[in-house]
C-alpha cells in the first residue's frame, strides 16, 4: 500500500491483532486453580518470625501476598499494593521495572515490623492490614490493550474496601487508576492531588490519545474527575504552553508550581494544597510522580527536571494527607531503575510509601493533628520541659 506521509493514522494492510494467538488472552486470564479449595486469606512468605530485608521473597513493605478479592475480604486488608509495569507510553523505557525496584529496595530499609516512623512513633506495618496483591496484567506491546485490565484490577481491590496503592510504571497509569476510582465512588466524587514536575494534561502525543503526558486531560474530558478537584503540586520546567495552560485554567485547575514555592515558600504551598485537596469531594486519590523530587534525590526517573522538591519537604505533606483526608487510592509512578545505579530512587520511593502509610495509620488511630509529633520524638530525651521556651 502506498502511504501518504501526511495522513494520520497511516493506512495499513497489516492487522493489529492475531485472533489465533492465545498468548494475548493468556496475559489477562486468571489461573483457574486460584478458585480451588484453599481457604481465603493472606499468604505470608516468611518462614521465620523475623527476617532481614535482604532475605526471602521480596514483597512491597514485606507484606504477605493476596491473590483474590476473597483473600482481601477474609483478612480485612486495608491497603493492597499493586505493581503495574507499564512503560509503553513514553520514549525512555525502564519504568516497567519500577515495581520490582521498589520491592527489592526493601533490602535497604529496616524490616518494618516494630520500627515506627520516627516523627510520629506510629508503625504502619503493624497498625494496618497490608497485602501485596501482585502485579496488574500488562500487554507490553500495547498501552491500549492494557488499560481496561488494569482498571478492572484496581476496581476489584477498591470494591473490597481496601485502598489500592499502585506502583508503576509510567504515568499513563493514572488514567485506568483514577477511572477505577470513579467506577467505585462515582464520577467527579474523587479529588486528585497530583505531585509531578509536569502537568500531564497535554493534547499533543504524536497523534495518540493516551501517553504519560496526557492522562489528566483524558480523565477530565471523559468526566471521571473534575478540573476543580485536580490539585497539582511541584510542576516546573518549560511546560505547559499557553494553549494547555489556558485549557487548565478554563477547567478550574488549582496548581502550585515551583514559582509559587519560590515566591511564597513551601509551608504556604503545603497548607494551601492540603486545604484544597478533596475540597468539595468526599474522597481523595494521591498521585506521586517520582520526578516531583529534585533529581539530586531521585535520579531514577524517565523525565528528570531540576529545581524539584526535597524528601524533607514531601514527607510531611504525604503524612498529613493520609491522616487528614479520606484517601481511597494512591499511585507512585515513573520509577526507572535502568538510569539509577545508586538505588537512591528506590530508597526514596520506599520512604514515600511508608510516609503515606504512616498517615493512613495515624488516621486509623485517631491522630489528625496537622502538626503532630510524638512527644518522645522531639523532647531530646529531656522530658516534658523540652524544648525550652522560645
Residue ranges and their predicted role:
Residues 2-390:
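Conserved alpha-helical scaffold segments that buttress catalytic/binding sites
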Amino acid at each position: 500500500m502506498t502511504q501518504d506521509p501526511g495522513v494520520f493514522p497511516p493506512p495499513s494492510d497489516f492487522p493489529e491483532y492475531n485472533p489465533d494467538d492465545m498468548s494475548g488472552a493468556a496475559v489477562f486470564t486468571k489461573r483457574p486453580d486460584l478458585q480451588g479449595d484453599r481457604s481465603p486469606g493472606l499468604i505470608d512468605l516468611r518462614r521465620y518470625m523475623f527476617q532481614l530485608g535482604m532475605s526471602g521473597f521480596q514483597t512491597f513493605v514485606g507484606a504477605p501476598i493476596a491473590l483474590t478479592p476473597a483473600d482481601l475480604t477474609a483478612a480485612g486488608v486495608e491497603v493492597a499494593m499493586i505493581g503495574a509495569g507499564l512503560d509503553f507510553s513514553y520514549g525512555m523505557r525502564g519504568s516497567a521495572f519500577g515495581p520490582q525496584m521498589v520491592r527489592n529496595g526493601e533490602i535497604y530499609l529496616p524490616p518494618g515490623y516494630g520500627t515506627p516512623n520516627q516523627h510520629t512513633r506510629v508503625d504502619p506495618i503493624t497498625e494496618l492490614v497490608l497485602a501485596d496483591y501482585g502485579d496488574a496484567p500488562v500487554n507490553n506491546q500495547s498501552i491500549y490493550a492494557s488499560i481496561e485490565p488494569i482498571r478492572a484490577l484496581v476496581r476489584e481491590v477498591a470494591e473490597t474496601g481496601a485502598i489500592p496503592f499502585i506502583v508503576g510504571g509510567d504515568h499513563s497509569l493514572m488514567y485506568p487508576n483514577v477511572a477505577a476510582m470513579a467506577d467505585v465512588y462515582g464520577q467527579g466524587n474523587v479529588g486528585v492531588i497530583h505531585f509531578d514536575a509536569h502537568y500531564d494534561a497535554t493534547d499533543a502525543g504524536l497523534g495518540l490519545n493516551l501517553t504519560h503526558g496526557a492522562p489528566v486531560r483524558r480523565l477530565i474530558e471523559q468526566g471521571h474527575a473534575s478540573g476543580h478537584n485536580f490539585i497539582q503540586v511541584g510542576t516546573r520546567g518549560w511546560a505547559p504552553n499557553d494553549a494547555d495552560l489556558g485549557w487548565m485554567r478554563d477547567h478550574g485547575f488549582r496548581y502550585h508550581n515551583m514559582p509559587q514555592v519560590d515566591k511564597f515558600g513551601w509551608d504556604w504551598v503545603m497548607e494551601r494544597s492540603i486545604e484544597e485537596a478533596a475540597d468539595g469531594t468526599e474522597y481523595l486519590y494521591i498521585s506521586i510522580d517520582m520526578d516531583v523530587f529534585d533529581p539530586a534525590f531521585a535520579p531514577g526517573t524517565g523525565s528528570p527536571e531540576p529545581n524539584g522538591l526535597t524528601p524533607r519537604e514531601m514527607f510531611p505533606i504525604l503524612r498529613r494527607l493520609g491522616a487528614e483526608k479520606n484517601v481511597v487510592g494512591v499511585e507512585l509512578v515513573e520509577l526507572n531503575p535502568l538510569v539509577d545505579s545508586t538505588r537512591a530512587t528506590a530508597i526514596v520511593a520506599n520512604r514515600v510509601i511508608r510516609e503515606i502509610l504512616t498517615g493512613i495509620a495515624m488516621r486509623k488511630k485517631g491522630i489528625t493533628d496537622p502538626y503532630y509529633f510524638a512527644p518522645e520524638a522531639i523532647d531530646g530525651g529531656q522530658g516534658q520541659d523540652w524544648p525550652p521556651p522560645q
